[in-house]
């Protein structure tokens, strides 16, 4: 695998900063403006994060043992870990970016069960300890591009999904991989209350083609910044597919099912004209309500430091993944 030379020092992002462009979709689902919070409050919250970290630190995760393969390392300075764990998209805990850090402490991540089933010869069940001990862990510094036109760089820790799927031995009928988040409304307020959770249908579900899932870049992620994932980042295990928009990165996974048919996905169900199944980062295919040609690389400085730069096809991973889509119309299959 080639080293990711496209990363520059300016690419390293202040993980704290997100933009809330999907609020209009949530309104279309019947969520009132009041329930989505007042604009002034949202703006004040965003600006408070640009000014600096004045929030309580996220609970410290357990330190992990992992390697640092040269292909996924660089000399870039990373932004403080408390910001990536303090400003998140995880609607099961609320719509505002600070809600997951405030509310996700209710999620019990140990014990945990992850089942691999469907079109496999050997169904598997992993427990909490298996997630960090069954496979060698490695740190990978990946770019992440949100569909909302911001981007960041994160040192995720995990293992390639293909190693897990190989143990289950996919059958010849397996064409897709379906993922499902835990359904625990007593722990996740957004699953109880549609005003908190944006009116989405829960549990959150996602999917990949089998060849996408088996690609070496696709990572089952159990840690970040050297430690186990905190709940607000998708503990104890989440998916990272770095050439796709961030909503493909399903969190707190309890089920992986191999299927012969394309599985449903949450945002595609909510707004099929806006969020496709593939969700490949593509500067030539705009969102219906904003351009995807450029993105905000948001650093650790103040709000005036935020600048736009061109979005890279497949988020800069075209050399590795473009062959997966040879002959596919990327405008039709967005």
Swiss-Prot record:
Keywords: Metal-binding, Molybdenum, Oxidoreductase, Periplasm, Signal. It is found in: Periplasm. Pfam families: Oxidored_molyb (PF00174). GO terms for molecular function: metal ion binding; molybdopterin cofactor binding; oxidoreductase activity, acting on a sulfur group of donors, quinone or similar compound as acceptor. Binds 1 Mo-molybdopterin (Mo-MPT) cofactor per subunit. Predicted to be exported by the Tat system. The position of the signal peptide cleavage has not been experimentally proven. It comes from the Bacteria. GO terms for biological process: protein repair. Its EC number is 1.8.5.-. Mo-molybdopterin binds at residues 88, 91-92, 146, 181, 233, 238, 249-251. It catalyses: L-methionyl-[protein] + a quinone + H2O = L-methionyl-(S)-S-oxide-[protein] + a quinol; L-methionyl-[protein] + a quinone + H2O = L-methionyl-(R)-S-oxide-[protein] + a quinol. Heterodimer of a catalytic subunit (MsrP) and a heme-binding subunit (MsrQ). Belongs to the MsrP family. This is Protein-methionine-sulfoxide reductase catalytic subunit MsrP. It comes from Escherichia coli O127:H6 (strain E2348/69 / EPEC). The gene is msrP.
């Amino acid at each position: 695998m080639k080293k990711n030379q496209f990363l520059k020092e300016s690419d390293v992002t202040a993980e704290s900063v997100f933009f809330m462009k999907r609020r209009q979709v949530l309104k279309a689902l019947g969520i009132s403006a009041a329930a989505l919070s007042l604009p002034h409050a949202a703006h004040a919250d965003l600006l408070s994060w640009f000014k600096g970290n004045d929030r309580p630190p996220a609970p410290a995760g357990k330190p992990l043992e992992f390697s640092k393969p040269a292909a996924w390392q660089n000399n870039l300075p990373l932004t403080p870990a408390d910001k990536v764990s303090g400003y998140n998209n995880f609607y099961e805990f609320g719509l505002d970016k600070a809600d997951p850090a405030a509310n996700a402490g209710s999620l019990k991540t140990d014990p945990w069960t992850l089942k691999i089933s469907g079109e496999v010869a050997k169904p598997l069940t992993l427990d909490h300890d298996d997630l960090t001990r069954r496979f060698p862990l490695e740190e990978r510094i990946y770019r992440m591009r949100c569909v909302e036109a911001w981007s960041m760089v994160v040192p995720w820790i995990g293992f390639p999904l293909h190693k897990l799927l190989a143990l289950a031995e996919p059958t010849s009928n397996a064409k897709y991989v379906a993922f499902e988040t835990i359904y625990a409304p007593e722990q996740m307020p957004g699953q109880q209350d549609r005003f908190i959770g944006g009116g989405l249908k829960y549990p959150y579900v996602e999917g990949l083609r089998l060849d996408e899932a088996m690609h070496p870049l696709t990572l089952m992620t159990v840690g970040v910044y050297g430690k186990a994932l905190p709940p607000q980042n998708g503990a104890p295990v989440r998916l990272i597919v770095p050439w796709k928009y961030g909503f493909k990165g399903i969190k707190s996974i309890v089920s992986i099912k191999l299927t012969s048919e394309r599985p449903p996905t949450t945002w595609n169900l909510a707004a099929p004209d806006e969020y496709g199944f593939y969700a490949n980062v593509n500067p030539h295919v705009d969102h219906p309500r904003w351009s995807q040609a450029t993105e905000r690389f948001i650093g650790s400085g103040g709000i005036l430091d935020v600048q736009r730069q061109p979005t890279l096809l497949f988020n800069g991973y075209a050399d590795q993944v473009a062959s997966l889509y040879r002959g596919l119309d990327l405008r039709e299959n967005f």
